């Protein structure tokens, strides 16, 4: 028993070191296979002995669903920052600082010349971590009102870059940071999500405010830390010294820390960050400029709301205010009934916005949204606009938004499942069936050319097509009398339907519309199980062993294939001649095998999809962003910030011509 406990302690130390190397230093020190082997050994030993260290990596993802959030009082206040939206406002602030320093010097204070540190302003959710004298992560909390936040320790523990125990620590301290969702994590989550996330910020905020810890873990959040709000013992002399302390403790920081000594320096940094912001793998909404010298900060002090020694330069907002005219309830493919806001038209980021997203009734209540009131609308990175909140002074004479009592499409009974309402009529509810057929026919699914939602609606209304299998029973005489369907169009559609019978297995699995199974997940599970029967009979343990398949997806797959209606539909499709084929991907032995490759710019001989497919056939991992883990960057014409970052990190850069020569040397 003693030997096993010693081995547990050893494994925890080793695995935490691996995580630090991978997530903080961006420099993996072990293969995924070796990490998984030692992680599995640790899980087994913990189960056998019942001994689990409070900073064990196995505690990062639990089966816990919490009952609610407890309040936490911060030891040091988390202040908001005053905001500037023009360089003139920054100049005014700078001039006030100069005047103050000169006045203090006249009174005998030995203050240094003003030096500012510019950092990115992350657009996520602020978190405050408390580490005790032993270095243990004691509490993690949201900002709240700056003095009292909500305890989200279990949620924050899922962020793999955050150490659960520091190697060395003598003094209790609180450290402030921002929990964020990267673009990569966002795309990966949405590829298999039944309800896709709208933007990165909501992805992060929603994860930390989710009581289901496994769902939080699925979001795969990251974090950056930038401030020590409270510390016992030694106090810092400068902000740069503080940042060195944060880094030395093993907490992730952003390497962008620019020293500015003049307005011209600040202007250059603003221009630089504005130029690269949309090439970053995460969202930022501005630049923070803060005085470096701590004594100067102490003397400057605070207003009621803000520290006087820092200011945030905010990029042009993509928000506007308008009136909520109505709420429309729409039925999706899964039967989920979702609210859409009907707005008084408003110009936002160069587009006239008339509709916006409202996620569910919980979201409506939390934001205090009411019909007739004015609402804040945000449009981020060309996604569907979303309502962010309500102007309280416009609530008079507004109307409460009521949830649906019946399906708005078919009038059937609705049920509340979690935060969402669902129509139970899966047999004849038009939007459900139409969208199911449209999804089945879509390009990434069965790729039935010329098939549209309008076509699906006509098939439902005029020909009583209510199942995907009914598509293969259509005849020319059925189609020819439909609106805008002549002989030629009817023949083309029938040929496309016939052609779809010979399909790839992963396309067929994706076409079936399994909840939370996107194209990538369909490919991954097909590569594991290789046939429909293999997937039908897959166990929970077998499913979660597939890369990127978690408990929720695994359970969704199992429940899907339990439904008699699903099995009958699949059997009918196969009897009608649908022939899903599994093509084993043959990885060519290549210099690119197991290498991480990023492409940037325009290539002459490959589209984006073609180069990705080519690299994957060579065994490469294709990434959308450059990091220290990147092995090669293939640079085409008009290569942008990815090329610049690769040069800064010393990543091997090759041209398209060099790429093909490397392949030629291998053949």
UniProtKB/Swiss-Prot annotation:
It catalyses: NAD(+) + (deoxyribonucleotide)n-3'-hydroxyl + 5'-phospho-(deoxyribonucleotide)m = (deoxyribonucleotide)n+m + AMP + beta-nicotinamide D-nucleotide. Pfam families: BRCT, DNA_ligase_aden, DNA_ligase_OB, HHH_2, HHH_5. The keyword Manganese applies. InterPro entries: BRCT_dom, BRCT_dom_sf, DisA/LigA_HHH, DNA_ligase, DNAligase_adenylation, DNAligase_N, Hlx-hairpin-Hlx_DNA-bd_motif, NA-bd_OB-fold. One of its GO terms (molecular function) is DNA ligase (NAD+) activity. Belongs to the NAD-dependent DNA ligase family. LigA subfamily. This is DNA ligase. It comes from Clostridium botulinum (strain Eklund 17B / Type B). The gene is ligA.
């Amino acid at each position: 028993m003693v030997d096993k406990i010693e081995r547990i302690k050893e494994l925890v130390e080793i695995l935490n070191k691996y995580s630090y190397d991978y997530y903080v230093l961006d420099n993996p020190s072990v293969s995924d296979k070796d990490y998984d082997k030692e992680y599995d050994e640790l899980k087994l030993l913990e189960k056998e002995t019942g001994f689990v260290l409070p900073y064990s990596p196995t505690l990062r993802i639990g089966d816990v669903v919490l009952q609610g959030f407890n309040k936490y009082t911060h030891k040091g206040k988390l202040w908001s920052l005053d905001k500037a939206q023009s360089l003139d406002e920054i100049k005014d602030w700078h001039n006030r600082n100069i005047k103050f320093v000169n006045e203090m010097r006249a009174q005998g204070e030995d203050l240094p010349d003003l030096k500012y540190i510019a950092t990115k302003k992350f657009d996520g959710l602020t978190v405050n971590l408390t580490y005790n004298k032993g270095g243990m992560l004691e509490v993690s909390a949201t900002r709240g009102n700056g003095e009292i936040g909500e305890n989200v320790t279990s949620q924050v523990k899922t962020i793999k870059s955050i150490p659960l125990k520091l190697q060395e620590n003598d003094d209790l301290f609180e450290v402030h940071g921002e929990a964020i969702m990267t673009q990569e994590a966002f795309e990966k989550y949405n590829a298999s999500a039944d309800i896709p996330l709208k933007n990165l910020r909501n992805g992060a905020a929603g994860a930390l405010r989710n009581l289901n810890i496994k769902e939080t873990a699925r979001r795969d959040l990251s974090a950056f830390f930038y401030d020590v709000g409270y510390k016992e013992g030694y106090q810092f002399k400068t902000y740069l010294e503080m940042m060195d302390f944060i880094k030395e403790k093993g907490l992730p920081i952003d390497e962008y820390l620019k020293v500015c000594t003049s307005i011209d320096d600040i202007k250059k940094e603003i221009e630089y960050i504005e130029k690269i912001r949309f090439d970053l793998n995460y969202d930022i909404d501005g630049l923070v400029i803060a005085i470096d010298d701590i004594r100067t900060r102490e003397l400057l002090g605070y207003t009621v709301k803000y520290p006087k020694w820092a200011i945030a330069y905010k990029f042009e907002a993509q928000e506007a205010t308008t009136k909520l005219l109505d709420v429309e309830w729409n039925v999706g493919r899964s039967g989920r009934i979702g609210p859409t806001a009907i707005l008084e038209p408003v110009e936002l980021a160069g587009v006239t916005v008339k509709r916006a997203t409202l996620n569910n009734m919980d979201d409506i209540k939390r934001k205090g949204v009411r019909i007739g009131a004015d609402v804040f609308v945000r449009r981020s990175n060309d996604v569907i606009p979303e309502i962010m909140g309500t102007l309280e002074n416009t609530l008079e004479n507004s109307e409460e938004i009521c949830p649906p009592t019946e399906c708005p499409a078919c009038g059937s009974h609705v049920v509340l499942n979690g935060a969402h309402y669902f129509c139970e009529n899966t047999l004849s509810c038009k939007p459900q069936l139409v969208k199911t057929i449209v999804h089945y026919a879509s390009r990434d699914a069965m790729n039935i050319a010329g098939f549209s939602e309008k076509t699906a609606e006509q098939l439902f209304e005029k020909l009583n097509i209510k199942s995907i299998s009914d598509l293969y029973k259509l005849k020319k005489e059925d189609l020819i009398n439909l609106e805008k369907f002549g002989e030629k169009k009817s023949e083309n559609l029938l040929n496309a339907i016939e052609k779809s019978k010979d399909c790839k297995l992963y396309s067929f699995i994706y076409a079936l519309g399994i909840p939370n199974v996107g194209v990538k997940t369909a490919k991954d599970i097909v590569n594991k199980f290789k046939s429909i029967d293999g997937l039908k009979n897959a166990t929970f343990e077998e499913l979660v062993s597939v890369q990127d398949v978690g408990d929720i997806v695994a359970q969704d797959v199992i429940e899907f294939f339990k439904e008699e209606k699903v099995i009958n539909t699949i059997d009918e499709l196969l009897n009608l001649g649908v022939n899903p084929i599994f093509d084993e991907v043959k990885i060519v032995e290549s210099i690119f095998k197991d290498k991480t490759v990023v492409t940037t710019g325009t290539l002459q001989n490959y589209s984006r999809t073609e180069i990705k497919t080519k690299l994957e056939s060579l065994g490469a991992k294709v990434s959308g962003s450059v990091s220290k883990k990147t092995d090669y960057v293939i640079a085409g014409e008009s290569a942008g910030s990815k090329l610049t970052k690769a040069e800064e990190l010393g990543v091997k850069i090759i041209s398209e011509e060099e790429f093909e020569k490397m392949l030629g040397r291998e053949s």
